[in-house]
Amino acid sequence: MASIRELHEQLVKKERSAVEITQETLDHIQELEPKLHSFLHITAQQALEQARAVDAKIAAGEEIGLLAGIPIGVKDNMCTKGIPTTCASRILENFVPPYESTVTQKLLDAGAVVVGKTNLDEFAMGSSTENSAYQVTANPWDLSRVPGGSSGGSAAAVAAEECVVALGSDTGGSIRQPASFCGVVGLKPTYGLVSRYGLVAYASSLDQIGPFGKSVEDTAILLKAIAGYDPKDSTSLKVEIPDYVASLKPDLKARGKLRIGVIKETFGEGLDSVVEQAVTKAIEQLQRLGAEIHVISCPNFRYGVPSYYIIAPSEASANLARYDGVKYGWRAPEGDNLLSMYKRTRATGFGAEVKRRIMIGTYALSAGYYDAYYLKAQKVRTLIKQDFENAFKNVDVLVSPTAPTTAFKAGEKTADPISMYLNDLMTIPVNLAGLPGLSLPCGFDEQGLPIGLQLIGKVLREDQLLQVAYAYEQSTSWHLSQPKIS
């Protein structure tokens, strides 16, 4: 599939219509979905209506933006008016929101064509998209393997060209890890840069919506469209949004000296040797492009996973208390009384992983353990944030592997939650610190599975992050590789 800019030029020159592009995309989805299961809901009728509106604008001689007529996928934990939003959970089965999330409203205002809602781990809790109550998404590079998670549906859809770009959410790595596994670009913005209004909450102090694309430029275009202050989100930042696309230059030294820090704690035990080799070669390539390379230490990085798995479940236990079968969503057959109905609904409506995290969070917040667990985890979070602040005194951008391995087999880790949690070892600290993080392809293993390089930036320096990613991408050809889906 062509890039956003190529499709835009075809539309403006009237070489193709938005309806033609949309119909071709829907046909491609219909062909691949029996194998991939990237989408929970395909919105063909609405998509074609949106495409016709774009064609009418072009016919009337009106100018259209870069995203007008572009097929986009949206993770199914973002509210879409009149379209089911299930969070891949039985408890929200058949829930149709009466309002639009801020990010999807921005897409519609830009003329984008939403072709469907993508699969995820239930309530975004997982690293493999195996926790969905409805279906398991396959990795386009190897259908027996997972696409990562929790935004696995969005990553797989972009990799398989079922849409040009897609939206995901990232609480502990849920955009970057699937981007790594599926060989696409995925960006988690600075906390507060993109509105969370209409995003179904998992852990409110960590959740952030971000873009997936086949290229850095496509990712930058989508970020520009969704970023910005929103009075409906109390954590939204009142900042000026730069032109992320204009900042993309193939010359890494276009803005002067660039210092890149390699986080030494992300190399060593637990890291696959083939991943280490690919990331090391990527760092060497950045050096050849003119970057100064420094090895730096973030000593508290290793405590990211244990602190995250206290903070995130604690917030989830509060956020998910609203699902009781009364106001919306699925309700279990009524029991003897109201309390019985609550219990039956929650016991049968939530999946095993969601119930596990609710229990962990409830335990960590209980009166006798609050100081020992939750308060301590928040102190560790502060230490991790300080590690990053100290590192950024000496460097501009940090690098690490995105994930310790390439995509694993479906079912391989479902019986071992700890092994599954360690998939986000490299990504979680970035969320705890509220920083921007990006994953882009930097190689393949011997089985042809993609490997991701993680770039971490200073607060609100997505422009610099995208510039480094673009310079690396333009000097390599990893992003041009395409999975052969049989």
UniProtKB/Swiss-Prot annotation:
State a GO cellular component annotated for this protein.
Answer: glutamyl-tRNA(Gln) amidotransferase complex
Question: Which GO terms label this protein's molecular function in UniProt?
Answer: ATP binding; glutaminyl-tRNA synthase (glutamine-hydrolyzing) activity
Q: Can you tell me which residues form the catalytic site?
A: K75 (charge relay system), S150 (charge relay system), S174 (acyl-ester intermediate)
Q: What is its EC number?
A: 6.3.5.7
Keywords, in A-Z order: ATP-binding, Ligase, Nucleotide-binding, Protein biosynthesis
Q: Which HAMAP family match?
A: GatA
- Role of this protein: Allows the formation of correctly charged Gln-tRNA(Gln) through the transamidation of misacylated Glu-tRNA(Gln) in organisms which lack glutaminyl-tRNA synthetase. The reaction takes place in the presence of glutamine and ATP through an activated gamma-phospho-Glu-tRNA(Gln).
Q: Which family does it belong to?
A: Belongs to the amidase family. GatA subfamily.
Task: State the name under which the record lists this protein.
Answer: Glutamyl-tRNA(Gln) amidotransferase subunit A
Species: Trichormus variabilis (strain ATCC 29413 / PCC 7937) (Anabaena variabilis)
Q: Which gene encodes it?
A: gatA
